[in-house]
Amino acid sequence: MEITKDDAIKARDFIWKNSKILGQASADRSYLEAFLKSKLALLMAESTETTMAGKEMYAKSHPDYIALLHGIKEAQNQEVTLKWQMDSAKITIEIYRTESANNRAIDKSM
């Protein structure tokens, strides 16, 4: 399968269009991971349990904490998916560059 100039341009445009989205996805994941610690502390403080283990069990089984974990999972999925799509676009461009250089070398030798 030969990669055309149009394919390389589409790959470049994809990277350009999605770079900000990837940055936001990464920031969202980082924020949620940091907030998870705060949420754990808030829920532990809210607990009526007397032991630390009891407070932690209450907090980690709380629906808000579980919802936050699901949010982190979704944010990480979005980030990783975009990262691999970006890597694929970069590889497409590199293959096009290599094929173009090879074709120029063949043309010179003829």
Regions found by a protein language model. Name each.
Residues 49-78:
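Short, glycine/alanine-rich amphipathic alpha-helical segment
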Residues 27-57:
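Extended alpha-helical coiled-coil "stalk/arm" regions
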Residues 2-3, 105-110:
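Short acidic DE-rich linear segments
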